[in-house]
Amino acid sequence: MMNGYDKQEALEYILKRIHAKDHPELADHLPELISQTIDADMAYMHEHHVIDEDGNAGTEYYEDDEAFEYMVEKLAEENDLDPVKAVKLASLVDDYMDYQQEYLESKGLVDWDDE
């Protein structure tokens, strides 16, 4: 997990902003899916050296498109989703990424490199 990151606080922050009406097929499972998405996001960051094993900044940059694909594939597999539900999940992950970024910025946990 990323140093300074509070998963429960992030989960609550994100769930307050994601509307069940926007994801009706997944609405009954939003808390579990967002929790799994956070875990998949952190796994992506560790595996791709965005954060190191101690939770500090790693040697690589976060690649949004790559992370998005990683999370969707991981969650679709973990939840045994058919292709139609996987597409619905992709929409949820897209929303998650927006609100996760907002959360990270609100906590001062992201640093934008101008290069």
Located regions from the model:
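Amphipathic alpha-helical interaction modules
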Residues: 22-70
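An amphipathic alpha-helix signature
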Residues: 7-16, 31, 35, 39, ...
